[in-house]
Protein backbone atom coordinates (compact mmCIF):
# COMPACT_ATOMS: atom_id res chain seq x y z
CA UNK A 1 0.00 0.00 0.00
CA UNK A 2 1.09 3.56 -0.71
CA UNK A 3 2.15 5.68 2.26
CA UNK A 4 2.17 9.44 2.65
CA UNK A 5 5.98 9.25 2.79
CA UNK A 6 6.04 7.69 -0.70
CA UNK A 7 3.90 10.55 -2.01
CA UNK A 8 6.29 13.03 -0.41
CA UNK A 9 9.27 11.24 -2.00
CA UNK A 10 7.52 11.45 -5.36
CA UNK A 11 7.03 15.18 -4.91
CA UNK A 12 10.71 15.69 -4.12
CA UNK A 13 11.43 14.49 -7.65
CA UNK A 14 8.41 15.97 -9.41
CA UNK A 15 8.50 19.50 -8.01
CA UNK A 16 11.22 20.43 -10.49
CA UNK A 17 9.17 19.03 -13.38
CA UNK A 18 5.47 19.70 -12.83
CA UNK A 19 3.62 22.98 -12.46
CA UNK A 20 2.37 23.73 -8.96
CA UNK A 21 -1.17 24.46 -10.07
CA UNK A 22 -3.24 27.03 -8.16
CA UNK A 23 -5.81 26.32 -5.46
CA UNK A 24 -8.24 29.22 -5.70
CA UNK A 25 -11.50 30.18 -4.05
CA UNK A 26 -14.14 30.64 -6.72
CA UNK A 27 -16.66 33.40 -5.89
CA UNK A 28 -19.31 32.26 -8.39
CA UNK A 29 -19.48 28.63 -7.22
CA UNK A 30 -19.14 29.66 -3.58
CA UNK A 31 -22.15 31.94 -3.90
CA UNK A 32 -24.13 29.35 -5.84
CA UNK A 33 -23.64 26.61 -3.24
CA UNK A 34 -23.35 28.80 -0.12
CA UNK A 35 -20.00 27.19 0.64
CA UNK A 36 -16.33 27.97 0.14
CA UNK A 37 -15.55 26.22 -3.14
CA UNK A 38 -11.87 25.99 -4.02
CA UNK A 39 -10.69 24.77 -7.42
CA UNK A 40 -7.43 22.87 -7.85
CA UNK A 41 -6.74 23.66 -11.49
CA UNK A 42 -4.80 20.73 -12.93
CA UNK A 43 -6.09 21.90 -16.31
CA UNK A 44 -3.21 24.41 -16.03
CA UNK A 45 -0.63 21.61 -15.73
CA UNK A 46 2.03 21.39 -18.46
CA UNK A 47 0.05 18.76 -20.37
CA UNK A 48 -3.26 20.26 -19.17
CA UNK A 49 -3.87 17.26 -16.91
CA UNK A 50 -2.71 15.77 -13.59
CA UNK A 51 -1.61 12.66 -15.48
CA UNK A 52 1.87 14.07 -16.02
CA UNK A 53 2.65 13.52 -12.35
CA UNK A 54 2.14 9.76 -12.28
CA UNK A 55 3.53 9.10 -15.75
CA UNK A 56 6.75 11.03 -15.20
CA UNK A 57 7.37 9.58 -11.75
CA UNK A 58 6.73 6.01 -12.89
CA UNK A 59 9.13 6.32 -15.82
CA UNK A 60 11.76 8.05 -13.70
CA UNK A 61 11.75 5.08 -11.31
CA UNK A 62 12.73 2.64 -14.08
CA UNK A 63 16.33 1.48 -14.28
CA UNK A 64 18.57 2.81 -17.06
CA UNK A 65 18.39 -0.61 -18.72
CA UNK A 66 14.58 -0.62 -18.64
CA UNK A 67 14.35 2.90 -20.05
CA UNK A 68 16.75 2.06 -22.86
CA UNK A 69 14.20 -0.45 -24.18
CA UNK A 70 11.51 2.22 -24.50
CA UNK A 71 8.16 2.24 -22.74
CA UNK A 72 4.61 1.28 -23.68
CA UNK A 73 1.33 2.72 -22.44
CA UNK A 74 -2.39 2.72 -23.15
CA UNK A 75 -4.49 5.82 -22.69
CA UNK A 76 -7.67 7.65 -23.65
CA UNK A 77 -5.50 10.74 -24.02
CA UNK A 78 -4.19 12.41 -20.89
CA UNK A 79 -1.92 9.63 -19.61
CA UNK A 80 -0.55 9.38 -23.14
CA UNK A 81 0.37 13.06 -23.07
CA UNK A 82 2.11 12.61 -19.74
CA UNK A 83 4.09 9.64 -21.05
CA UNK A 84 4.91 11.52 -24.26
CA UNK A 85 6.17 14.53 -22.29
CA UNK A 86 8.27 12.31 -20.01
CA UNK A 87 9.70 10.32 -22.93
CA UNK A 88 10.77 13.53 -24.63
CA UNK A 89 12.30 14.99 -21.47
CA UNK A 90 14.10 11.75 -20.56
CA UNK A 91 15.14 11.04 -24.16
CA UNK A 92 13.54 7.60 -24.48
CA UNK A 93 11.08 6.07 -26.94
CA UNK A 94 7.40 5.43 -26.19
CA UNK A 95 4.80 3.36 -28.02
CA UNK A 96 1.38 4.71 -27.12
CA UNK A 97 -1.86 2.78 -27.67
CA UNK A 98 -5.04 4.87 -27.83
CA UNK A 99 -8.68 4.01 -28.63
CA UNK A 100 -9.83 4.77 -32.16
CA UNK A 101 -12.48 7.00 -30.56
CA UNK A 102 -9.89 9.32 -28.94
CA UNK A 103 -10.59 12.99 -29.76
CA UNK A 104 -8.23 14.37 -32.41
CA UNK A 105 -7.16 17.14 -30.06
CA UNK A 106 -5.66 14.62 -27.65
CA UNK A 107 -3.91 12.68 -30.41
CA UNK A 108 -2.32 15.83 -31.81
CA UNK A 109 -1.20 16.89 -28.33
CA UNK A 110 0.51 13.53 -27.78
CA UNK A 111 2.45 14.09 -30.99
CA UNK A 112 3.28 17.64 -29.90
CA UNK A 113 4.62 16.67 -26.47
CA UNK A 114 6.43 13.52 -27.60
CA UNK A 115 7.77 14.73 -30.95
CA UNK A 116 9.99 12.06 -32.54
CA UNK A 117 10.09 9.99 -29.35
CA UNK A 118 6.55 8.60 -29.68
CA UNK A 119 4.75 6.14 -31.93
CA UNK A 120 0.95 6.16 -31.71
CA UNK A 121 -1.20 3.10 -32.36
CA UNK A 122 -4.97 3.55 -32.53
CA UNK A 123 -6.58 0.26 -31.51
CA UNK A 124 -9.99 -0.62 -30.03
CA UNK A 125 -13.16 1.35 -29.31
CA UNK A 126 -12.48 1.74 -25.58
CA UNK A 127 -9.54 2.26 -23.25
CA UNK A 128 -9.81 -1.33 -22.02
CA UNK A 129 -9.43 -2.74 -25.54
CA UNK A 130 -6.40 -0.53 -26.17
CA UNK A 131 -4.90 -1.56 -22.84
CA UNK A 132 -5.12 -5.26 -23.70
CA UNK A 133 -3.31 -4.65 -26.98
CA UNK A 134 -0.67 -2.49 -25.29
CA UNK A 135 0.06 -5.06 -22.58
CA UNK A 136 0.43 -7.81 -25.19
CA UNK A 137 2.82 -5.61 -27.19
CA UNK A 138 4.79 -4.82 -24.02
CA UNK A 139 5.24 -8.50 -23.19
CA UNK A 140 6.08 -9.55 -26.74
CA UNK A 141 8.74 -6.85 -27.08
CA UNK A 142 10.09 -6.84 -23.51
CA UNK A 143 9.29 -3.16 -22.99
CA UNK A 144 8.12 -1.72 -19.64
CA UNK A 145 4.38 -1.02 -19.50
CA UNK A 146 3.49 2.28 -17.82
CA UNK A 147 0.08 1.61 -16.34
CA UNK A 148 -2.27 4.62 -16.37
CA UNK A 149 -3.54 3.99 -12.84
CA UNK A 150 -2.88 0.58 -11.29
CA UNK A 151 0.79 1.08 -10.45
CA UNK A 152 2.24 2.15 -7.11
CA UNK A 153 4.60 4.73 -8.60
CA UNK A 154 1.81 6.20 -10.74
CA UNK A 155 -0.46 6.36 -7.68
CA UNK A 156 2.27 8.04 -5.62
CA UNK A 157 2.78 10.58 -8.39
CA UNK A 158 -0.92 11.37 -8.61
CA UNK A 159 -1.02 11.71 -4.83
CA UNK A 160 1.18 14.79 -5.09
CA UNK A 161 -1.97 16.68 -6.09
CA UNK A 162 -3.17 16.18 -2.51
CA UNK A 163 0.19 17.22 -1.07
CA UNK A 164 -0.06 20.51 -2.94
CA UNK A 165 -3.71 21.03 -2.00
CA UNK A 166 -3.09 20.70 1.73
CA UNK A 167 0.09 22.80 1.63
CA UNK A 168 -1.76 25.55 -0.25
CA UNK A 169 -4.77 25.32 2.07
CA UNK A 170 -2.50 25.59 5.13
CA UNK A 171 -0.83 28.66 3.66
CA UNK A 172 -4.27 30.23 3.20
CA UNK A 173 -5.35 29.26 6.72
CA UNK A 174 -8.02 26.82 5.51
CA UNK A 175 -9.16 23.57 7.11
CA UNK A 176 -10.66 21.44 4.35
CA UNK A 177 -13.89 19.51 4.88
CA UNK A 178 -14.24 17.61 1.60
CA UNK A 179 -12.29 16.99 -1.61
CA UNK A 180 -14.22 15.89 -4.70
CA UNK A 181 -12.10 13.58 -6.85
CA UNK A 182 -12.81 12.03 -10.26
CA UNK A 183 -12.62 8.27 -10.69
CA UNK A 184 -11.74 6.51 -13.92
CA UNK A 185 -9.33 3.70 -13.15
CA UNK A 186 -8.80 5.13 -9.68
CA UNK A 187 -5.18 6.34 -9.74
CA UNK A 188 -5.91 9.93 -8.73
CA UNK A 189 -8.30 9.13 -5.90
CA UNK A 190 -6.04 6.33 -4.63
CA UNK A 191 -3.05 8.67 -4.41
CA UNK A 192 -5.06 11.47 -2.83
CA UNK A 193 -6.63 9.07 -0.33
CA UNK A 194 -3.28 7.48 0.60
CA UNK A 195 -1.81 10.88 1.43
CA UNK A 196 -4.80 12.61 2.99
CA UNK A 197 -6.00 9.79 5.24
CA UNK A 198 -2.56 9.55 6.83
CA UNK A 199 -1.76 13.25 7.09
CA UNK A 200 -5.21 14.90 7.21
CA UNK A 201 -7.74 12.22 8.25
CA UNK A 202 -10.38 14.81 9.16
CA UNK A 203 -10.89 15.68 5.46
CA UNK A 204 -13.44 13.53 3.64
CA UNK A 205 -12.58 12.28 0.16
CA UNK A 206 -15.59 11.93 -2.14
CA UNK A 207 -15.30 9.85 -5.29
CA UNK A 208 -17.06 11.02 -8.44
CA UNK A 209 -17.83 8.92 -11.52
CA UNK A 210 -19.69 9.58 -14.74
CA UNK A 211 -23.10 7.91 -14.59
CA UNK A 212 -22.37 5.92 -17.73
CA UNK A 213 -19.13 4.45 -16.38
CA UNK A 214 -19.55 3.60 -12.69
CA UNK A 215 -16.86 0.92 -12.53
CA UNK A 216 -15.76 1.77 -8.98
CA UNK A 217 -19.34 1.63 -7.73
CA UNK A 218 -19.61 -1.80 -9.36
CA UNK A 219 -16.39 -2.87 -7.63
CA UNK A 220 -17.74 -1.69 -4.27
CA UNK A 221 -20.91 -3.71 -4.83
CA UNK A 222 -19.04 -6.86 -5.91
CA UNK A 223 -16.28 -6.59 -3.31
CA UNK A 224 -13.65 -6.58 -6.06
CA UNK A 225 -13.02 -4.96 -9.46
CA UNK A 226 -15.44 -6.15 -12.13
CA UNK A 227 -15.78 -5.28 -15.80
CA UNK A 228 -18.79 -3.29 -16.98
CA UNK A 229 -20.26 -4.66 -20.20
CA UNK A 230 -21.11 -1.22 -21.54
CA UNK A 231 -19.83 2.26 -20.72
CA UNK A 232 -20.72 5.70 -22.02
CA UNK A 233 -17.53 7.14 -23.53
CA UNK A 234 -18.65 10.77 -23.33
CA UNK A 235 -16.40 11.56 -20.36
CA UNK A 236 -13.54 9.80 -22.12
CA UNK A 237 -10.91 10.62 -19.50
CA UNK A 238 -12.76 8.55 -16.88
CA UNK A 239 -14.58 6.10 -19.16
CA UNK A 240 -12.97 2.94 -17.81
CA UNK A 241 -14.78 -0.40 -17.66
CA UNK A 242 -12.57 -1.96 -14.97
CA UNK A 243 -10.90 -0.11 -12.10
CA UNK A 244 -7.47 -1.14 -10.87
CA UNK A 245 -6.96 -3.83 -8.25
CA UNK A 246 -4.49 -1.67 -6.32
CA UNK A 247 -6.59 1.47 -6.58
CA UNK A 248 -9.69 -0.37 -5.38
CA UNK A 249 -7.86 -1.82 -2.39
CA UNK A 250 -6.49 1.60 -1.46
CA UNK A 251 -9.86 3.33 -1.30
CA UNK A 252 -12.60 0.76 -0.66
CA UNK A 253 -12.55 1.08 3.13
CA UNK A 254 -11.54 4.75 3.20
CA UNK A 255 -13.73 6.51 0.63
CA UNK A 256 -17.26 6.15 1.97
CA UNK A 257 -19.19 8.16 -0.60
CA UNK A 258 -19.25 7.62 -4.37
CA UNK A 259 -21.35 9.91 -6.56
CA UNK A 260 -22.50 9.22 -10.13
CA UNK A 261 -22.98 12.32 -12.28
CA UNK A 262 -25.26 12.37 -15.31
CA UNK A 263 -23.44 13.17 -18.55
CA UNK A 264 -25.97 15.93 -19.17
CA UNK A 265 -25.06 17.60 -15.88
CA UNK A 266 -21.38 17.26 -16.78
CA UNK A 267 -22.11 19.01 -20.09
CA UNK A 268 -24.01 21.78 -18.32
CA UNK A 269 -21.06 22.23 -15.96
CA UNK A 270 -18.51 22.42 -18.80
CA UNK A 271 -20.48 25.31 -20.32
CA UNK A 272 -20.92 26.96 -16.92
CA UNK A 273 -17.20 26.75 -16.12
CA UNK A 274 -16.37 28.35 -19.44
CA UNK A 275 -19.02 31.08 -19.47
CA UNK A 276 -18.90 32.04 -15.78
CA UNK A 277 -15.32 31.25 -14.77
CA UNK A 278 -13.40 31.27 -18.06
CA UNK A 279 -12.16 27.71 -17.40
CA UNK A 280 -11.77 25.22 -20.24
CA UNK A 281 -12.47 21.78 -18.74
CA UNK A 282 -12.85 18.46 -20.49
CA UNK A 283 -15.82 16.27 -19.47
CA UNK A 284 -13.78 14.30 -16.92
CA UNK A 285 -12.30 17.53 -15.59
CA UNK A 286 -15.70 19.09 -14.95
CA UNK A 287 -17.16 16.04 -13.21
CA UNK A 288 -16.01 17.01 -9.71
CA UNK A 289 -17.71 20.41 -9.95
CA UNK A 290 -20.85 18.85 -11.43
CA UNK A 291 -21.09 16.56 -8.40
CA UNK A 292 -21.60 19.53 -6.08
CA UNK A 293 -25.17 19.72 -7.35
CA UNK A 294 -25.89 16.21 -6.06
CA UNK A 295 -25.17 16.98 -2.41
CA UNK A 296 -25.58 20.75 -2.33
CA UNK A 297 -27.41 20.70 0.99
CA UNK A 298 -24.59 18.72 2.65
CA UNK A 299 -21.84 21.15 1.64
CA UNK A 300 -23.39 24.43 2.79
CA UNK A 301 -20.94 26.39 4.92
CA UNK A 302 -18.13 23.89 4.26
CA UNK A 303 -14.64 24.29 2.79
CA UNK A 304 -14.71 22.23 -0.40
CA UNK A 305 -12.07 21.43 -3.01
CA UNK A 306 -12.96 20.31 -6.53
CA UNK A 307 -10.16 19.10 -8.77
CA UNK A 308 -10.34 20.27 -12.38
CA UNK A 309 -8.42 17.19 -13.48
CA UNK A 310 -7.93 18.12 -17.13
CA UNK A 311 -8.59 20.72 -19.79
CA UNK A 312 -7.96 18.79 -22.99
CA UNK A 313 -11.33 19.45 -24.59
CA UNK A 314 -11.72 19.05 -28.34
CA UNK A 315 -13.54 22.15 -29.63
CA UNK A 316 -15.34 19.99 -32.20
CA UNK A 317 -17.24 18.36 -29.30
CA UNK A 318 -18.85 21.59 -28.13
CA UNK A 319 -21.99 21.07 -30.23
CA UNK A 320 -22.53 17.66 -28.60
CA UNK A 321 -21.83 19.13 -25.16
CA UNK A 322 -24.35 21.92 -25.69
CA UNK A 323 -26.91 19.43 -27.00
CA UNK A 324 -26.53 17.16 -23.97
CA UNK A 325 -26.81 20.14 -21.64
CA UNK A 326 -30.03 21.38 -23.25
CA UNK A 327 -31.57 17.92 -23.07
CA UNK A 328 -30.56 17.54 -19.42
CA UNK A 329 -32.06 20.94 -18.58
CA UNK A 330 -35.36 19.85 -20.14
CA UNK A 331 -35.20 22.48 -22.87
CA UNK A 332 -34.64 20.33 -25.95
CA UNK A 333 -36.92 17.49 -27.03
CA UNK A 334 -37.32 15.23 -30.05
CA UNK A 335 -40.52 13.70 -31.41
CA UNK A 336 -41.80 11.71 -34.36
CA UNK A 337 -45.08 13.39 -35.31
CA UNK A 338 -47.48 12.39 -38.08
CA UNK A 339 -48.21 15.33 -40.36
CA UNK A 340 -51.24 15.57 -42.67
CA UNK A 341 -50.01 15.45 -46.27
CA UNK A 342 -51.65 18.70 -47.30
CA UNK A 343 -50.45 22.25 -47.94
CA UNK A 344 -50.24 24.39 -44.81
CA UNK A 345 -49.75 21.51 -42.33
CA UNK A 346 -46.42 22.89 -41.12
CA UNK A 347 -47.90 26.38 -40.74
CA UNK A 348 -50.68 24.90 -38.60
CA UNK A 349 -48.16 23.02 -36.47
CA UNK A 350 -46.04 26.11 -35.86
CA UNK A 351 -48.99 28.34 -34.98
CA UNK A 352 -50.88 25.79 -32.86
CA UNK A 353 -48.07 23.83 -31.18
CA UNK A 354 -45.11 26.11 -30.54
CA UNK A 355 -45.09 28.67 -27.76
CA UNK A 356 -44.21 32.28 -28.61
CA UNK A 357 -40.56 31.80 -27.56
CA UNK A 358 -40.09 28.17 -28.64
CA UNK A 359 -38.16 27.13 -31.72
CA UNK A 360 -37.88 24.22 -34.15
CA UNK A 361 -34.27 23.02 -34.22
CA UNK A 362 -34.75 19.98 -36.46
CA UNK A 363 -37.33 19.07 -39.06
CA UNK A 364 -37.06 16.04 -41.35
CA UNK A 365 -40.02 15.07 -43.53
CA UNK A 366 -40.52 13.01 -46.67
CA UNK A 367 -43.83 13.58 -48.44
CA UNK A 368 -45.60 10.45 -49.69
CA UNK A 369 -48.43 11.20 -52.08
CA UNK A 370 -50.13 7.83 -51.58
CA UNK A 371 -50.78 8.35 -47.86
CA UNK A 372 -52.89 10.76 -45.85
CA UNK A 373 -50.23 11.31 -43.20
CA UNK A 374 -46.45 11.02 -43.03
CA UNK A 375 -44.01 10.80 -40.09
CA UNK A 376 -41.81 13.78 -39.36
CA UNK A 377 -38.81 14.05 -37.04
CA UNK A 378 -39.12 17.29 -35.06
CA UNK A 379 -36.67 18.83 -32.60
CA UNK A 380 -38.13 21.53 -30.35
CA UNK A 381 -36.24 23.97 -28.13
CA UNK A 382 -38.31 25.38 -25.27
CA UNK A 383 -37.60 28.75 -23.71
CA UNK A 384 -38.58 27.36 -20.29
CA UNK A 385 -38.51 23.72 -19.16
CA UNK A 386 -41.78 24.25 -17.26
CA UNK A 387 -43.57 24.61 -20.62
CA UNK A 388 -43.04 20.91 -21.39
CA UNK A 389 -46.38 19.60 -20.11
CA UNK A 390 -48.40 22.14 -22.06
CA UNK A 391 -46.33 21.36 -25.18
CA UNK A 392 -47.20 17.67 -24.84
CA UNK A 393 -50.90 18.52 -24.49
CA UNK A 394 -50.80 20.51 -27.74
CA UNK A 395 -48.87 17.79 -29.59
CA UNK A 396 -51.40 15.16 -28.48
CA UNK A 397 -54.22 17.25 -29.92
CA UNK A 398 -52.30 17.53 -33.20
CA UNK A 399 -51.33 13.81 -33.36
CA UNK A 400 -52.34 11.37 -30.65
CA UNK A 401 -49.97 8.75 -32.14
CA UNK A 402 -46.83 10.86 -31.74
CA UNK A 403 -43.64 9.26 -30.35
CA UNK A 404 -41.46 10.97 -27.74
CA UNK A 405 -37.92 9.84 -28.55
CA UNK A 406 -36.66 10.48 -25.03
CA UNK A 407 -37.79 6.96 -24.14
CA UNK A 408 -36.07 5.35 -27.12
CA UNK A 409 -32.41 5.01 -26.15
CA UNK A 410 -31.11 3.95 -29.57
CA UNK A 411 -32.79 6.71 -31.57
CA UNK A 412 -32.18 9.31 -28.88
CA UNK A 413 -28.47 8.50 -28.73
CA UNK A 414 -28.30 8.82 -32.51
CA UNK A 415 -29.74 12.33 -32.31
CA UNK A 416 -27.94 13.58 -29.20
From Swiss-Prot:
Cofactors named for this entry: pyridoxal 5'-phosphate
PROSITE patterns: ACT_LIKE, DEHYDRATASE_SER_THR
EC annotation from Swiss-Prot or TrEMBL: 4.3.1.19
A Pfam family the protein falls into: Thr_dehydrat_C
Pathway membership: Amino-acid biosynthesis; L-isoleucine biosynthesis; 2-oxobutanoate from L-threonine: step 1/1
Binding site for pyridoxal 5'-phosphate: 78, 184-188, 309
Catalytic reactions of this protein: L-threonine = 2-oxobutanoate + NH4(+)
Residues the record lists as N6-(pyridoxal phosphate)lysine modifications: 51
Gene3D superfamilies, per database record: 3.40.50.1100
Keyword Amino-acid biosynthesis: yes
Family indicated by similarity: Belongs to the serine/threonine dehydratase family.
PANTHER family to which the protein is assigned, alphabetical: THREONINE DEHYDRATASE, MITOCHONDRIAL (PTHR48078:SF11), THREONINE DEHYDRATASE, MITOCHONDRIAL-RELATED (PTHR48078)
Protein name, per record: L-threonine dehydratase biosynthetic IlvA
Name of the gene: ilvA
